[in-house]
Amino acid sequence: MNIIAGFQNNFSEGLYTKFKSYRYRVFVEYLGWELNCPNNEETRIQFDKVDTAYVVAQDRESNIIGCARLLPTTQPYLLGEIFPQLLNGMPIPCSPEIWELSRFSAVDFSKPPSSSSQAVSSPISIAILQEAINFAREQGAKQLITTSPLGVERLLRAAGFRAHRAGPPMMIDGYSMFACLIDV
């Protein structure tokens, strides 16, 4: 497995195109999210900017098998703009020391998991998360914040990551979701 972390301009055009197609396949086709995606790939959407950071995992054949997006909370980000209610009245983080981790996926389409918990706890997902933490730390982050399904909390702790809730879980679109802080 090869994992690359960097800003969009650090990726070749070919890899970035494969990455957008992978995200479309995961989030639109596999998870059923309703996103405006022409040409069966995710184009730059609300939080994808030139200075957005990504983590991309590839297998030995260079197929993408996982990804994540990283944004400093000093610019608009998913939790702060779309799901602030998950913070339970806490001020929306806005600090170069807190980065948002979003669009996290660890789906290897050559052998998809039988459950979402397997996808989150797989060696691929642990490696992607560790690389995201390392990259964010290099940028000066001390914490990551995510919008996550509740089961992720238990899996993060089981994998040895220091994580805690930023607010109580809430039902969003039929899922028990929470804001999770992960120490970097």
UniProtKB/Swiss-Prot annotation:
Pfam families: Autoind_synth. Disruption phenotype: Mutant fails to produce any detectable AHL signals and is impaired in biofilm development. InterPro entries: Acyl_CoA_acyltransferase, Autoind_synthase. Its EC number is 2.3.1.184. PROSITE patterns: AUTOINDUCER_SYNTH_2. One of its GO terms (molecular function) is N-acyl homoserine lactone synthase activity. The keyword Transferase applies. The keyword S-adenosyl-L-methionine applies. It catalyses: a fatty acyl-[ACP] + S-adenosyl-L-methionine = an N-acyl-L-homoserine lactone + S-methyl-5'-thioadenosine + holo-[ACP] + H(+). GO terms for biological process: quorum sensing; signal transduction. Belongs to the autoinducer synthase family. Involved in the synthesis of the acyl-homoserine lactone (AHL) signal N-(3-hydroxydodecanoyl)-L-HSL (3-hydroxy-C(12)-HSL or OH-dDHL). Required for normal biofilm development. This is Acyl-homoserine-lactone synthase. It comes from Acinetobacter baumannii.
